[in-house]
Design a protein with these regions (language model features):
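Active-site-facing substrate-recognition patch
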Residues: 12-61, 111
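Short glycine-rich phosphate-binding loop at a beta-alpha junction
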Residues: 61-68
Length: 183
């Protein structure tokens, strides 16, 4: 049918053409990978969500979690489609209830990430969503927080992986799915 053909054709969509490079942002020497063109194209955005969802067994995930802020844009529709609760990792001082925290280093600085102390239960199996893996610092801090709950990250999914920054090295023993890799 025509709908099946459209679905198959979209599966071969080159999503990298919807990523825009912004030189010297947020600081000089960094080339920022802007996902807003992908988000503003309904077909590209839907294809991104579908590729992530198609990579996971819903029965092996209890919670979809995400990292502030671009990860939220992906995780909300993924959690909805998987019929799983959504948990948010936020920058320090952004959550109103009692929190647990972990510090991390970025490609261009450092920071602290927090999560509500009741957001995850022991033995929860988590799918962690973000827009990008660079050095792995932010996602590594999320893994540290998940460990504090005695839960487990069953997978990490991102749109973009900057593999030349070796972020996977910090995220050992976790299955990582990235749609676009820059070497």
């Amino acid at each position: 049918s025509v709908l099946q053909w459209i679905s198959i054709k979209k599966r071969h969509m080159d999503l990298s053409k919807y990523i825009r490079d912004i030189p010297d942002f947020p600081i000089e020497g960094i080339i920022f990978k802007d996902i807003t063109p992908l988000l503003s194209n309904t077909h590209a955005f839907q294809e991104t969500i579908n590729r992530i969802i198609d990579n996971y067994n819903f029965d092996e995930i209890d919670v979809v979690a995400s990292v502030e802020s671009r990860g939220f844009l992906l995780a909300a529709p993924i959690a909805d489609r998987m019929k799983k609760p959504l948990v948010l990792f936020r920058k320090s001082g952004k959550l109103p209830y009692k929190t647990k925290s972990a510090s991390y280093d970025l490609e261009y600085g450092s920071g602290t990430i927090e999560i509500h102390e009741d957001a995850i239960k022991a033995n929860d199996r988590i799918l962690l969503i973000d827009d990008l893996i660079a050095t792995g610092g932010t996602l590594g801090a999320c893994l540290d927080l998940v460990d504090q709950f005695k839960a487990k990250v069953n997978g990490i999914a991102v749109i973009i992986e900057l593999s030349f920054l070796n972020g996977r090295d910090l995220l050992k023993n976790v299955d990582i799915f990235s749609i676009i890799k820059y070497d």
